[in-house]
């Protein structure tokens, strides 16, 4: 097996000087190491609690390329298991979601309870006359499963920091989506899934760090939908709220720490000029007082923003899109997109959120297609030997990082910077090159201390 020292990880990433070698997006050995040391050691989003409300409810997803099933237990707790029969490695759960009393392998009929225990083996007395220790052959359980305000995460590594410590200061930014109203959030509708022919790090980096692209990649949408905001509840494109926020915002910042990233504008209006139908904008205006009381002015107004929890959980404030970038190969990622809304919103508002999220950021969304085209074209170019071994510039905002004194936490910069991208690649390199989580944490702390000198 190729080792981290063979790959010279830190020769491919130079975050202190803002350099990245695009071989990191194409190398199959790097990809295999990512599956082991990133997706095998980091906290990964599994599901929202609203998707499995009752005992026996399950949801099938992935941790890296490993299929897992998340199940609500009889006592209300949540477990996750490798979706693999212990007999011949067959998948035991095929439906995307549902409710069940047991998971039965279609190959030889081995059956497992929702707690993962092997409960039935067909023809057991005749097939195993010597006896079979069924307690030894239950489903492989994900050892670490925790929830944060409705979001369920899993981790294979018992030595990893707890979920809240892992999130760190990104939790403050995440709360701006999860904690706007009493009752929290829920997933509306199903999951939209599609494949993009690019490396998973392209979308993760963009959602962590890149507001810069919107001025150019989404220029056509800005031109078509950039009408003045008249404060009405008109539908998108009919003179309401699509004016680009960078034209009206008072200020903006980017957060980048521990591999996570976020960026947002300081806006003046509760609807924040986001790419949504007027019904959604009206909802934000009507619920602003509650959000401000719970979150404070900055986060209550923070509806135009991009975010990524390392490695692959992204969301956009305002447009209600939550998505996971499931890696499929060095040059392919599968997108799973959810619509997340306040649970207290009316059914009509939830439907408007879902329509707006799909229109802008669904697989055929007028903004999503701009992004996908960029990532796919880059991946095509990186088939070239010189292209994938050149150096790329990651210097935007280099040396301008600061910690604020107004209660906004973490390492920050102006929104048009690459602080979060540099931090993401530093955490990426630290994970790939370290044998233990403590080593990772020490390296990341040293990097962040150097950044803030």
Curated annotation (Swiss-Prot):
Gene3D superfamilies: Naphthalene 1,2-dioxygenase Alpha Subunit, Chain A, domain 1, Rieske [2Fe-2S] iron-sulphur domain. It comes from the Bacteria. Pathway: Aromatic compound metabolism; 3-phenylpropanoate degradation. Keywords: 2Fe-2S, Aromatic hydrocarbons catabolism, Dioxygenase, Iron, Iron-sulfur, Metal-binding, NAD, Oxidoreductase. Its cofactor is Fe cation; [2Fe-2S] cluster. Binds 1 Fe cation. Binds 1 [2Fe-2S] cluster per subunit. This dioxygenase system consists of four proteins: the two subunits of the hydroxylase component (HcaE and HcaF), a ferredoxin (HcaC) and a ferredoxin reductase (HcaD). Part of the multicomponent 3-phenylpropionate dioxygenase. Converts 3-phenylpropionic acid (PP) and cinnamic acid (CI) into 3-phenylpropionate-dihydrodiol (PP-dihydrodiol) and cinnamic acid-dihydrodiol (CI-dihydrodiol), respectively. This is 3-phenylpropionate/cinnamic acid dioxygenase subunit alpha.
